[in-house]
Design a protein with these regions (language model features):
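DNA replication initiation on ssDNA origins
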Residues: 1-77, 85, 140, 167, ...
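DNA replication initiation modules
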Residues: 49-50, 58-86, 110-175
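Active-site palm subdomain of RNA-directed nucleic acid polymerases
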Residues: 88-96
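Short, conserved phosphate-binding/catalytic loop or strand-edge motifs used
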Residues: 96-105, 142
Length: 175
């Protein structure tokens, strides 16, 4: 299933037509492959790989071939693994998707870009405040909605993104 147009429009806040999006594929054998695609290629990428691989992407732009912290560019998104925690009612994600039963990932949209060093501070504060999974660096790979989670004996569909698309004022991201 392709990503819905609205969510692709959200992704375009961070990625221009020709910008590279860093992606990853995890095979059941444990072999991991990194690569890049453009936003125009995302539906084809999902269709080609979701049935056989865990499919991930980095939601922050990267300058260069390597997905390293020093190559991260400013982003409009904060992204987090909400595994084992409640979706916060006082600071709900702009969009979230279920990656397996009762486990979610969320994306918060900022009205202004967030510098990589500020992202790290905000992400760690969110982890602490809301008890999110600690894997929260700006270049972390997260599941792509509408793919399949092959981590379990019975594969789980990753849901379509849900949420109202709230755009948070940068100064109100309080974490």
């Amino acid at each position: 299933m392709p990503l819905d147009k609205k969510f692709k429009d959200v992704l375009s806040l961070n990625f221009g037509k020709d910008d590279e999006i860093h992606v990853g594929l995890l095979a059941s054998s444990g072999q991991f492959n990194n690569g890049t695609i453009t936003l125009d290629e995302i539906d084809e990428f999902i269709a080609e790989y979701k049935d056989d691989y865990n499919v991930f992407m980095c939601y922050a732009p990267i300058d260069g071939e390597d997905r390293l912290l020093e190559n991260a560019k400013p982003t409009r998104f904060l992204v987090a693994d909400i595994d084992g925690a409640e979706i916060p009612k006082e600071f709900p994600p702009s969009y979230y998707w279920e990656t397996s039963p009762n486990k979610y990932q969320g994306l918060w949209i900022s009205d202004k870009v967030i510098a990589p060093k500020d992202y790290e501070v905000l992400a760690h504060a969110m982890v602490k405040k809301f008890k999110f999974d600690s894997a929260s660096d700006i270049v972390h790979l997260y599941r792509i909605p509408t793919t399949i989670n092959h981590k379990y004996a019975t594969p789980q569909e990753v849901s379509e993104p849900k949420g109202d698309g709230t755009v948070y004022r940068r100064q109100d991201i309080f974490c």
